[in-house]
């Protein structure tokens, strides 16, 4: 590995080694090679371009659509002793001119810009006059029409790079890209002989679960009662749901805030800051919240409603556990969610695309919704479902998700599955799920008589079953490939590959489980989730809390989020290593030279004070009674 890169990592960021995938990306950039890196949230994508940016001559331009992310990244870089700036609509024209003037004079190594800035005359003139060694495209999936967040302004990046006096290295980063989106990024950005680094989509510290539950409000209250001190995000699909849940929790005394586009800018900013600065542990929000939020200590993300795509879910759920600590991602599912999401898709604005593209995009969106519904209904491993969607190979159940830990009842539904096939064959693939299920149940509906399905052989064939059972069976048969739903606005049910069902040895086994609603009378049990703090003794945890208190004090003084001072993980390492001088403090993971100069003495004094007050305290589980490792 490049020695200078390792030294830069240690000096500025306080880490001894690169994480998985980072080293390969950094080396490729330093070899003047274009790069596309697909790395999960929390994998340290920013270090992949920040380290080479500090080593290479000239300036690195980082293109990001997220104002809040730019501001947080620049704050974090400045804290690490790195001169960086951002240029976006939050600055006045005079502030922008000053930033460009200082950059032209060599003050800044890294400049974050919004993609719209690439069409600005003043910025283009600046870009032609300075040495730009690298253009970094963050959230690179935004350049793909098949990505979940396509932004037309990203297409301008190609012309911007082309018109520079000398072609810089182009590096692109994203956390969410299917094979189709990956190829689109490579092609659209015109990457030359790129190194493609895919570290995988598996966030091993995240525990995924789906709860098919009626009383969602009770579940949320019960969950918060069991995690009272933890930071969490609760996503809702509509503003109305956000407001209703906020009012309910607020009235019950929960320290909670909210975020959606219906609130004015000032209120949104205040509520977001209250959450980021740890003043309010829980935020309820629409998906307008979170893009670019780098808060590392979010311990849980609850989806009150089903998101519209796996890409959205992976990205939103991925805001939990960015610090590597074990965290939970809970999706509360009901059939009503599908109806709401379908309504939101039907009302989507297509005024800026032609008719052919509208048809293709609608098909894509409906297919994504069906895949998301499949995730909510699968009885298989949830982690594998996510990984396989993104094209990753899996090797057996993960044993770290809700489905892997559930007790299922297995029922042979082969006879019923064959009747479903017969019914769909009789409809000749013309009708949707509701008609097929109604026919099989023998429902007395005027619509069925009107369509003539009451004359089918399959009419009433499964009248000894419930609608819920048949929905679950059809969902499982769809997952197995025996059936599929079309991707039109009004999707219909059609036959897939049914040849295995002709074999008498083939059985369709349906797995079911009993959903348990929260018991209001039962006292909440504390979470048993494993954390890094489990490595600390009671005394060690007391020191950790003292260091957190000091961190919050410093964060208020510096007007920045606490995690930018030091992450929880760094504070835990301080408790375990218990440094007594600056040299030992530099051995703590996440303590670089600049942060040592700024904050080292205050943290050393806090540790020394604690040790003087409790001289015989054993701080970590790895120590024996004499305090030896």
Residue ranges, per PLM feature:
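Helicase motor core with emphasis on the C-terminal RecA-like subdomain
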Residues: 3-12, 16, 20, 24-46, ...
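Short alpha-helical segment immediately N-terminal to, or the first helix within
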Residues: 28, 303, 375, 573-574
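Catalytic cores of large soluble enzymes that bind and process phosphate-bearing ligands
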Residues: 91, 173-177, 212, 360-364, ...
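Short, charged low-complexity linear segments at domain edges
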Residues: 360-390
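Conserved Rossmann-like nucleotide-cofactor binding loop
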Residues: 68
